[in-house]
Amino acid sequence: MTGAAMNFTYKTVMPEDIDILVTTRIEVLRAANKLDDDVDMTEVAVQSRAYYEKALKDGSHTAILVYDKEKIIGAGGISYFEVMPTYHNPTGKKAYIMNMYTNPAYRRMGIAYHTLSLLVEDAKNKGIDAISLEATEMGRPMYEKFGFAGMKDEMELK
């Protein structure tokens, strides 16, 4: 970790942190989707809580919150799952990075890059090399700098 990114605290979320994690998740979704505060996110919050309660307990999700003293300024998460083994991924284990966010006042300080490195390290420590993510236009250059590349062999049903 270099530069300004070292001045902050990166905390791996524990089950007792679910309240703040759900609140942060809703804030990230509002920001990413440009949703006003009057948009009802109750169902998303309820489902997010249920997801985190299960996934943090069974290890199928790791979340990181970034603090500037007591203020949350960033977040990131990685979900783990299995598919059928393939030639390129004989274990079938995969990881998907999501919920990456940095408060606009703290951007361009290396916070997202360091959060990403912690999440990738967590996956590698679990023996998972097949790591993917969905990138916004703003985030794409940072992900490419880290080593992520566009995928040509996958499609999504619309």
Say what each PLM segment does.
Residues 106, 110-118:
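Conserved acetyl-CoA pyrophosphate-binding loop and the N-cap/start of the following alpha-helix
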